[in-house]
Amino acid sequence: MLRKLTVDQINDWFTIGKTVTNVELLGLPPAFPAEAPREEVQRSEEVPSEAPTAQAQDPVKATALARPASAFGRSLSQRSSEVEYINKYRQLEAQELDIYGQDQPPSGPGLRSPLAKISNVACIPETTYKYPDLPINRCKEEVISLIESNSVVIIHGATGSGKSTQLPQYVLDHYTQRSAFCNIVVTQPRKIGASSIARWISKERSWTLGGLVGYQVGLEKTATEDTRLIYMTTGVLLQKIVSAKSLMEFTHVFIDEVHERTEEMDFLLLVVRKLLRTNSRFVKVILMSATINCKQFADYFAVPVQNKMNPAYVFEVEGKPHTIEQYYLNDLGHIYHSGLPPYRLEEPVITKDVYEVAVSLIQMFDDLDMKESGNKTWSGAQFVSERSSVLVFLPGLGEINYMHELLTNMIHKRLQVYPLHSSVTLEEQNNVFLSPVPGYRKIILSTNIAESSVTVPDVKYVIDFCLTRTLVCDEDTNYQSLRLSWASKTSCDQRKGRAGRVSKGYCYRLIHRDFWDSAIPDHVVPEMLRCPLGSTVLKVKLLDMGEPRALLATALSPPSLSDIERTILLLKEVGALAVSGQREDENPHDGELTFLGRVLAQLPVSQQLGKLIVLGHVFGCLDECLIIAAALSLKNFFTMPFRQHLDGYRNKVHFSGSSRSDCLALVEAFRAWQACRQRGELRHPKDELDWGRLNYIQIKRIREVAELYEELKNRISQFNMFVDPRHPVLDQEYPYKQRFILQVVLAGAFYPNYFTFGQPDEEMAVRELAGRDPKTTVVLKHIPPYGFLYYKQLQSLFRQCGQVKSIVFDGAKAFVEFSRNPTERFKTLPAVNLAVKMSQLKVSLELSIHAAEEIEGKVQGGSVSKLRNTRVNVDFQKQTVDPMQVSFNTLDRPRTVADLLLTVDVTEVVEVGHFWGYRIDERNAELLRQLTAEINRLELVPLPIHPHPDLVCLAPFTDYNKESYFRAQILYVSGNSAEVFFVDYGNRSHVDLDLLREIPCQLLELPFQALEFKICKMRPSAKSLICGEHWSGGANGRFAALVSGCPLLVKVFSIVHSVLHVDVYRYSGAQDAVNIRDVLIREGYAELAEESYESKQSYEVLKGFFAKSVDTMPDGSVSSPMKDDEKHLIQILLESFASNRLGAPNCKAVLHGPFNPYELKCHSLTRISKFRCVWIEKESINSVVISDSPADLHQRMLVAASLSVNETGSTMLLRETSLMPHIPGLPALLSMLFAPVMELRVDREGKCYTGVLCGLGWNSTTEAPILPEHDIELAFDVCFNVEDIVEINILRAAINKLACDGPHGPKYLGPERIAQLQENARQKLLGLFCRLKPREKITPQWHEKPYEWNQVDPRLVIEQAEREGGPGKSTCLYQLHTPVVLSP
């Protein structure tokens, strides 16, 4: 045995390629015990003894099977290079093993580790336990002897033979009886398996859970220092041994279900195998499975003995609990009569017919139960007292829900149906193990979670659709996708073994026998060959065992070299591995671990979420980022029930506020829940559940998020990252700045998941809406003839969206307009978003109607036929239904404006540039005096109906101590009062409900005299957007001061949807008039903007109108006899319909829509996805995005936290999205700020930057882009200069100071210094975006060679004098960019 290993020798051993010297060996190599025959697992003579075989088949062939698209595309030389890399490093490993070939640990039952210690358990209970009669019990002593005599033992036994539950207990009892120390760990692939087995053992043995036996799954640990048998998930054990670089904490390591071949499983086997041969030689390893490829695993764990590789010992557990009969579709001809279509390997699917076969089988089981109970005849009116349970294997939640619905409709069959899926709650999982009500049959609908992790003992029947969903990595994009595929024979055999635990079992495979034989694969493709390797490579780097490819070449199924290369590049892109300053020195197979990489390797979250946490620490928003990372790592705690999806969506939008970010909605909801708990409002479980239901939040999941949040806080504390307990000094702008910084941090963490939106065609959109306001209106199609008859049905369909103001019927189209609060800022109404969301959710909009011919036949002898497709306006505010003239809305001259120059008094400021007022010329003043006098002469009566928003009435207002009534519109009702808007003046007031009065009809005829104004050609500056809700508090205060205290002169530019777009002038003493827009722009609150297409059209029309004599203009208000006739016929029809003279509606009309032509479509910025179709998941706030400012051509940016692709790779699905503020140049700024490498584009004269190419850069050796798929090419739409690039570099350097290794790194800084660096980073970030003078707008110029690197003359590149950490050696998060010199 080894006398002594020094630290240096151990480190040398861990680094593949280094030789270990000066090792003293003692003792002779032991012989294997006589009771361990090895004939069945000996290697064939063809396998070289010095190279351990990883798998039965060629690893490169396995890779080809896993990735057919890439494998068939590879050249022969590329494939041979894959073989070379595996063979090279395996031979290296074999040579190093030769040093220790004679140094095997002595065998024998009395062996103990040198670190063995006496248990500190005060009293281990004497075992008088009688083991259940399972197959493994018959060979108990033999198995214990084998485990004690061998380093590695493989246990192969049928499902239900007792491997997982009994064997670890045998070892525990064996050591307990001898008063010897042991510490046994058993891995399970799933949490539910580890916890349920530990619970079962503790219950069987009457032990306290967490005492002698315990478990650890994820964040949940039920174990103490006295625990001697612990069950844990594969990942938990892997994290433990990677951190310790040793197995010596345990005496026995049981690895269960090794056939599953997950990435974690294969890496665990690799590390265990490595450690067994180095510093953990006394630990016993036991591999267990029912469907294991024994030779493959035995060869993999072979050890050199006397110049020969001896495979690990394989023990076969003979016998099965009970026989299991299996059947295929061929055997079920008596159930289905119509021929089922043949299955195809490339098209895994479940047809409706196959579902029906499964349902028929479940009904047939009563016959089987009766026959087995001895009752030969069964009438169907009775059931056996104990009906055996049925386990149905389905590929996913959607299929489970469909089958659940089929079975729950069979009420008379007395079935208790339970879903079993990773997303169901713990309580629902526990229901699976409960005995059913007597006389009822338990049906479990499960994914492959019940394949191995969960054993339900009373299952007699298994129905297997032979399908599964596997996580695969798309060849082109590297994005993950859950794909439906055929399960392997190994998995199906595991499923079969779930039956027959207590009696004879039956397994029904719903495929044909010949398809099983010829098409179903034998084994599952290992995850290491089909999934991203990021977390595995980081753990390899943490182990410091040399290049990742060197270690991974010794895996059971080595990943392809190209996959390792790609993983290294993706880790460099995220910043976990350093990007070399010298691109030609870049190692495609390795990289230096950065501070970020070390953090990521310790966190149980994805690389992007780990980066989010680190960037949150840098910019002082760590708490928010921890919440987001915890929430996105687990199942979404927002719930959107099937029939309440719109309500759930509305609730999520409410939590997001105006941020339009799913991530920020998570933060706000989590903090709202936390605040309620801290206030004691959720002290009782029922109160908490009620709060969750009210807010569409799943309480169990938000609690899990809280646990992970605390766990992440604890883990990052080792890196000197702490949430600041001090409350920040709050100023008016702080919450808005914090929100913006968090949005930027999200963009940094999720680079390069960047998307923009296509621009709507304004001209076409105006036509589609017939000139109506897109912010308040949606379009419906397929309106039936005489559609106006059904306006109440239509109104009720949209009631869940918002208050409908009017509906205009125009032929087969209808325009539904929602009420807008006149005192809220211009934006697309939430009601419009919800209406479009209804269309996206395919909510059925169905009307009960009369056939057109029936209406014409029953009313006035068919004279109403002229109304079949006439234009009709239903105004719910005025409660009128009137025919409409042909109108172009914005092109009509409004009757309320007699001149383009007006003098106004401002009565209500909504926000900067948006206000209400009224004309103060003599003519208008006289009109208002007469109106007020007429109102107050009348005998006013109380409202005949309950007040509601949008109702026009009369309300009191006191002016100069005199109370008078004025026309008003109710904005909202709260308790016994209402807020009203005075429609002739533009101001608002709170009024008691009992003071409101009904408005006489004649007072509604005069148009409302208050005017709504919007300053034209102006938009908020970046500073205003960042420091406020669209406009900053400072901007609002400055504007209010400019427009108050004196009359204003306004010059009308255009009239759009009854809003006057104007230039506003203020006279100040004897000075000239001051243009308020110019003042706001000069002071940095605003910037110039383009007017919309509608506004420009209106401007041209108004110029024409006022160029002519007003007297010659036609009066559009004059009613024509034809319209009077139409109105009379409409009233007749409405009365006939209301009085039911037409009879009951006998037809249905399904409407199409609703639509809004300004809805935006998303496009990816990365090269590989630029032309792929992009969908945003329906649960996202941004699944509906409607343009508020179509005239603004600057790109709007969207960031996605995660992406996946469909099975064909043609469509991308975005999840957890955030819509960034509409700041000109934002996509370019964020891309340059967070890209690993960038190359600036210049115009032909070299005088200005025209764009940028972002990515991992260019390799001058290979003369090719390093990661071309993720390159982002952008053309600038604002002007950037050298100073901007310098500012970006300064900010990147500021980030590095809080995200780097070394003696001056953040791990060694005090809290005050960290706070200073954080504030410095925040201020530099805000300074980059908030400029007094906005960046000049330019016309985008696309580079003539898009996506091509190395296009800049090297003589013009400004090399950075000092790169942090030195050239090519830096482990900082971001390298500094190289600016390009511009010509004067």
Swiss-Prot record:
Gene3D superfamilies: 1.20.120.1080, 2.30.30.140, 2.40.50.90, P-loop containing nucleotide triphosphate hydrolases. Residues 379-546 form the Helicase C-terminal domain. A motif (DEAH box) lies at residues 256-259. SUPFAM superfamilies: P-loop containing nucleoside triphosphate hydrolases, Tudor/PWWP/MBT. Keywords: ATP-binding, Cytoplasm, Developmental protein, Differentiation, Helicase, Hydrolase, Meiosis, Nucleotide-binding, Nucleus, RNA-mediated gene silencing, Spermatogenesis. Its EC number is 3.6.4.13. Residues 36-46 have a biased composition (Basic and acidic residues). It comes from the Eukaryota. The keyword NAD does not apply. ATP-binding RNA helicase which plays a central role during spermatogenesis by repressing transposable elements and preventing their mobilization, which is essential for the germline integrity. Acts via the piRNA metabolic process, which mediates the repression of transposable elements during meiosis by forming complexes composed of piRNAs and Piwi proteins and governs the methylation and subsequent repression of transposons. This is ATP-dependent RNA helicase TDRD9.
